[in-house]
């Protein structure tokens, strides 16, 4: 049964239209009630990114938590992984990140974490949805039991120290010129500070948030500004985070972009050499490049694939005992340290390899030649074209045409009203032809719905 509010990464939509103060308050009430276990004073940690609507949602959630007797601990602008870490570290009952990640300022969202710092399971989110429809009149606290709200002091320093401790104490980034792009988002203070404290020469862009410019022409989804700055400053490396800093892309010293697949390859090879992999393989999604899979096989590692979404990567990692996984988009999960994707920590693991090998980033990060990959999106206003018999036949035929030389992935987005069609293989012309044909068929089916 399709869910009304929760997608693949919490609740997300246009601020004050989909993500309203009323919805935010009700989500806080439902979550607060659900996680009230034991007789202790209940607490919720709340972080946010820098978009204008985050204030509105934050205050609405404070009201919701307070109304059911839960204290709200306010972090202000902080990366998603910092919220996850601090939720667990501060023994809170629940954590909240107010963010729409890489989306523009018009959107916002709510990500929820349990007391262990992990994102909530589908089952728990479904319980919250059920509670949203049931109402809370009988669950509201008495006046003497209402929750309080308070700002947390020193949270930024705690996260920076946490990130630094993922490296050996003897490692210094001295001698490296690093350009870091914080997307005018949640990491605009912590990322530059952490890199500077580790000894790097830091040049920062995307560190002037105004409520409207998050992800606008900067960050991991718009790396052109970082590419330009790396070349201009003759930097050793560029690090691009997204709006809530749970994903990262790298730019090498030549200005070439290094995606999450290449980054996972570097870390996997390094951890294998050091004996740090908990299993002889890593976890990625169906969207990761075939070249990554072939590279891992060449060094004796396997690639387990999941549905798209870092939560599904993490669920498979936890159930099967992996400690490294991620997505091509730059969500890298290092479960020895983190309970969710952490762009800064992933970048630090790469920098550790660069320092150890004493080679340029371009040499360190080019582990494999990516298979030609074509990704298209078809906007769907209504209907379910993937359930159309003609679309199913076309997909089956396309897979037979690719045979063993490639892959085809067709899926509905969990965050937008689009169907994504991805094809990859050794023959780029064939892949492009197949993807374009499928997009036309899906679009035609959607129009006929």
UniProtKB/Swiss-Prot annotation:
The active site is at residue 101. Binds 1 Mg(2+) ion per subunit. It is an enzyme of class 5 (isomerase). Keywords: Isomerase, Magnesium, Metal-binding, Phosphoprotein. Activated by phosphorylation. Its EC number is 5.4.2.10. GO terms for biological process: carbohydrate metabolic process; peptidoglycan biosynthetic process; UDP-N-acetylglucosamine biosynthetic process. Mg(2+) binds at residues 101, 242, 244, 246. One of its GO terms (molecular function) is phosphoglucosamine mutase activity. The keyword Isomerase applies. InterPro entries: A-D-PHexomutase_a/b/a-I (IPR005844), A-D-PHexomutase_a/b/a-I/II/III (IPR016055), A-D-PHexomutase_a/b/a-II (IPR005845), A-D-PHexomutase_a/b/a-III (IPR005846), A-D-PHexomutase_C (IPR005843), A-D-PHexomutase_C_sf (IPR036900), Alpha-D-phosphohexomutase_SF (IPR005841), GlmM_bact (IPR006352). CDD domains: GlmM. GO terms for cellular component: cytosol. It comes from the Bacteria. Belongs to the phosphohexose mutase family. HAMAP family: GlmM_B. Catalyzes the conversion of glucosamine-6-phosphate to glucosamine-1-phosphate. This is Phosphoglucosamine mutase.
């Amino acid at each position: 049964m399709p869910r009304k509010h929760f997608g693949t990464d919490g609740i997300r939509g246009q601020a004050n239209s989909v993500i309203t103060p009323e919805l935010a308050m009700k989500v806080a009430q439902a979550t607060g009630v659900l996680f009230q276990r034991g007789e202790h004073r209940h607490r919720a940690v709340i972080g946010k990114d820098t978009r204008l609507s985050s204030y509105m949602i934050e205050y609405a959630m404070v009201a919701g938590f307070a109304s059911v007797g839960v204290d709200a601990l306010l972090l202000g602008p902080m990366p998603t992984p910092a919220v996850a870490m601090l939720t667990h570290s501060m023994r809170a009952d629940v954590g909240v990140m107010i963010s729409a990640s890489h989306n523009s300022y018009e959107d916002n969202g709510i990500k929820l974490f349990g007391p262990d710092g992990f994102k909530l399971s589908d089952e728990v989110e479904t319980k919250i949805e059920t509670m949203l429809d049931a109402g809370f009149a009988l669950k509201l606290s008495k006046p003497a039991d209402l929750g309080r709200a308070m700002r947390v002091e020193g949270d930024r320093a705690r996260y920076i120290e946490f990130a630094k401790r993922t490296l050996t104490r003897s490692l210094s980034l001295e001698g490296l010129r690093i350009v870091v792009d914080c997307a005018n988002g949640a990491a605009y203070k912590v990322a530059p500070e952490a890199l500077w404290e580790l000894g790097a020469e830091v040049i920062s862009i995307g560190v002037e948030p105004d409520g409207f410019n998050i992800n606008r022409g900067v960050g991991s989804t718009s790396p052109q500004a970082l590419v330009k700055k790396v070349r201009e400053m003759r930097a050793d490396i560029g690090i691009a985070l997204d709006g809530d800093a749970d994903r990262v892309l790298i730019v090498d010293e030549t200005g070439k972009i290094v995606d999450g697949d290449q980054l996972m390859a570097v870390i996997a090879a390094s951890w294998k050499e050091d004996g740090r992999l908990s299993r002889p393989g890593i976890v990625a999604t169906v969207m990761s490049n075939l070249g990554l899979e072939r590279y891992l096989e060449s060094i004796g590692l396997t690639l387990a694939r999941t549905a798209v979404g870092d939560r599904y990567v993490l669920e498979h990692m936890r159930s099967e005992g992996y400690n490294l996984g991620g997505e091509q988009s730059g969500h890298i999960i290092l479960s020895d340290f983190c309970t969710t994707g952490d762009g800064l920590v992933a970048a630090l693991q790469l920098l550790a390899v660069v320092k150890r090998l004493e080679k340029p980033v371009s040499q360190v990060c080019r582990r494999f030649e990516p298979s030609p990959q074509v990704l298209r999106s078809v906007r769907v206003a209504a209907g379910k074209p993937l359930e159309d018999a003609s679309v199913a036949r076309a997909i089956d035929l396309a897979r037979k045409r690719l045979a063993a030389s490639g892959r085809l992935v067709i899926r509905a987005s969990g965050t937008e009203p689009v169907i994504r069609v991805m094809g990859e293989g050794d023959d780029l012309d064939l892949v492009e032809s197949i993807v374009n044909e499928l997009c036309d068929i899906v679009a035609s089916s959607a129009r006929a719905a």
